Amino acid sequence: MKNKKRVLIASSLSCAILLLSAATTQANSAHKDSQDQNKKEHVDKSQQKDKRNVTNKDKNSTVPDDIGKNGKITKRTETVYDEKTNILQNLQFDFIDDPTYDKNVLLVKKQGSIHSNLKFESHKEEKNSNWLKYPSEYHVDFQVKRNRKTEILDQLPKNKISTAKVDSTFSYSSGGKFDSTKGIGRTSSNSYSKTISYNQQNYDTIASGKNNNWHVHWSVIANDLKYGGEVKNRNDELLFYRNTRIATVENPELSFASKYRYPALVRSGFNPEFLTYLSNEKSNEKTQFEVTYTRNQDILKNRPGIHYAPSILEKNKDGQRLIVTYEVDWKNKTVKVVDKYSDDNKPYKEG
């Protein structure tokens, strides 16, 4: 009898434990499902927010800003891509409506991408048959077309910059006052700010000394290039050189250091961010701007295999450019593309 009671008690305890375990598992599962659902909803909301942000960024907009009691900003964006040159222009036009200033105000931010178009080529007709074409210079040019009533008053960047990263902030205050500083951030409590930020490791930015009130030009030029454990100047014929018996005319890439070691601006390309501040007399209704993005290429020529033949360097031997003309309607604060063309074998040459 005692043994029967023990069996019944043990059986009851086992059932209770099983029921408790099942309930706990179900509760944990429900809690996990709830957590997963919350997480999914959070992710979905975050993605929707990101989509809204992207959509809002892409739209032309008029927004109030801290530039005076009745000041406002109208933003426009124009994008032009050219497949032949692999160059993209993305321009932001910020119209500043300042009732305390007697002129129209416009900030133009020049963005986009100039792909490197890095190429290894084989030219069997030459002794130095293995060629490397790489982007030694990038150029951005902005000019006002035949209109003296529209003037360029400021630009970013200025002078020469050799740091790996370029950061600057332009600030506009009511009454036509403007200022610019290095770094990112507002320069005063009552202003509209616009920043530029881009990478140029192993390159230098140089603002042309010939810039004036209707024309500005920036050059981004290779300097000392670091790849793997090597550091060589752009003017060195042995730049990216590799003397190896496995290189053949059929495999020109083997005559040079691995491209995965090259600096980003050589391997991938350049993403410019340049800023121009303009004023326009209110009697003038429309102005055209011509914007040119150019890629200059140096050619390095090596002879395949083990040898003592010198390498050959040809600077600015090739180049491609994209030229776009934009028209600004000052009264309606709109922008449109009125002309576009591109060409090869057109490296930029100052003069």
Curated annotation (Swiss-Prot):
Record InterPro entries: Bi-component_toxin_staph, Leukocidin/Hemolysin_toxin, Leukocidin/porin_MspA_sf
A Pfam cross-reference name: Leukocidin
Gene3D superfamilies assigned to the protein according to its UniProt record, in alphabetical order: Leukocidin/porin MspA
Domain of life assignment: Bacteria
Stretches with biased composition (Basic and acidic residues): 30-60
Location of region: Disordered: 29-71
Signal peptide boundaries: 1-27
Family to which this protein belongs: Belongs to the aerolysin family.
Name of the protein in its database record: Uncharacterized leukocidin-like protein 2
Organism in which the protein naturally occurs: Staphylococcus aureus (strain Mu50 / ATCC 700699)
Phylogenetic placement of the source organism: Bacteria, Bacillati, Bacillota, Bacilli, Bacillales
